[in-house]
A protein has these predicted regions:
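Short loop/turn segments that connect beta-strands within beta-propeller blades
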Residues: 70-73, 110-114, 149-153, 194-198, ...
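Structural signature of WD-repeat beta-propellers
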Residues: 61-62, 101-102, 140-141, 185-186, ...
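Loop/turn-rich, solvent-exposed surfaces of beta-rich toroidal or solenoidal domains
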Residues: 272-280, 289-323
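Extracytoplasmic beta-rich repeat domains
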Residues: 3-8, 14, 18, 27-51, ...
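WD40 beta-propeller blade core
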Residues: 67, 107, 146, 191, ...
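C-terminal closing repeat unit and adjoining cap/tail of repeat-based domains
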Residues: 316-362, 368-372
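Beta-propeller domains
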Residues: 61-72
Length: 372
């Protein structure tokens, strides 16, 4: 059965006639209730992210609008207008709000939305800037990594890694652990560098390059690596999920599966969306063996999966949020939060039963999941 599933996803997922699967009836065992919704700006939100705490949410719109909201009620605390188009963000924290504008400037604002500094980034940025250990990290589309001083905005170091002539733009987020930065790169590489200096530590081949032409050989790691004790997991676009030893870079196990999305991990099982939008649960203790697969949402351009209580939650291109049982993969809940508007790539679990997200028109939504 697993072989048949892999054939369906791996070999038929590349067809040009990938029509989104129609919504199917299901046995409702969980409900999704909208707590509040708030619109940011007058323009779309591209695929912008947001930052949040227990008390507040900060989100942006591509027209330069920034908005701080109460987490409990959605009430607007303040609004700011930036005289540039916002392309990437929001990142950072509530003391240092980060985003990238269309003309390649990285901005840093304080908790009231006032500018602290901005610097020019020499290259395209496609991932949200992050703060770790009082430093700012920016990932460029050509896979370069920048460390920037949080107080002054000065560049401390730059890590440059060679990329193939033909590669996807670098969109994977970085993972930080024990003074090491892990990131996916072109040609199916997972790379580790020292956080303090940007010095290279090791690289591992997550996916084997196959084929003759550059297109045939195209394989990148576009998902955020996941840490599990002495292992790090990464998945490639061309068909491999791999567990790597963090000390030696040795391959512990690998299995065939492809994904462009970030993966979720609960300490035992790995949850990921195949590039066909089938959703898998894989046993990390058994070399990635399939626990279950759900193909009900194929080609619906789903978001990164998140774990919320005893469910997996994903959004899709039609504004739906779906709940799948964590143990079985069966759909148990669904709600159309944004009518005919795609949910942004990232939705976020808040505690065990709430979800925060933003759609591509800049509507921020806060929902509660209840078992029925």
């Amino acid at each position: 059965e697993d072989f048949v599933d892999q054939m369906d996803d791996q070999y038929f997922a590349d067809e040009f006639n990938n029509i989104p699967t129609e919504i199917k009836p299901y046995d409702k065992k969980a409900s999704i209730e909208l707590i509040w919704e708030n619109k940011v700006g007058d323009n779309d939100a591209h695929n912008l992210n947001l930052i949040f705490s227990q008390e507040f949410v900060i989100a942006a719109s591509s027209d330069g609008s920034l908005q701080k909201m109460q987490m409990a009620t959605g009430e607007t605390v303040w609004e700011r207008e930036i005289p540039e188009e916002i392309m990437i963000g929001v990142g950072g924290n509530f003391e240092n709000i980060l985003f990238i504008t269309k003309n390649s400037y990285l901005w840093c604002l304080d908790s009231e939305g006032n500018a602290i500094w901005k610097i020019f980034i020499d290259g395209e940025v496609l991932t949200t800037p992050v703060i770790n250990n009082k430093k700012v990290y920016v990932r460029l589309a050509n896979y370069e990594i920048l460390q920037i001083d949080l107080k002054q905005g000065d560049i401390d170091w730059k890590y440059i890694h060679s990329t193939p002539a033909l590669a996807f733009n670098g969109t994977s987020s970085l993972t930080f652990s024990d003074g090491v930065i892990y990131g996916g790169f072109g040609a199916g590489k997972l790379v580790a560098v020292h956080q303090n200096s940007g010095a290279f530590i090791w690289e591992a081949d997550i996916s084997q390059i196959k084929g003759v032409t550059d297109i045939d050989r195209l394989t990148d790691v576009l998902s955020k690596p996941i840490i599990n004790d002495a292992q790090v997991y990464a998945v490639s676009t061309s068909g491999d999920l791999t567990s790597v030893d963090r000390r030696s870079a040795d391959i512990i196990w690998t299995r065939k599966i492809s994904s462009f999305n970030d993966i979720a991990f609960d300490g035992f099982d790995i949850y990921l969306a195949h590039k066909s939008d089938s959703i898998y649960s894989l046993d990390s203790k058994k070399n990635g063996k399939t626990n279950w697969r759900n193909a009900d949402l194929q080609y619906r351009r789903i978001t990164n999966p998140i774990i919320i209580g005893n469910h997996i939650a994903v959004g899709d291109f039609d504004g739906y949020v779906h709940l799948l049982n964590l143990e079985t993969g069966v759909v148990e809940g669904r709600a159309q939060i944004s009518s005919d508007v795609p949910i942004g790539k990232n939705i976020h679990p808040i505690g065990n039963n709430k979800i925060l997200g933003i759609d591509l028109e800049g509507n921020v939504f806060y929902m509660q999941v209840k078992n029925v």
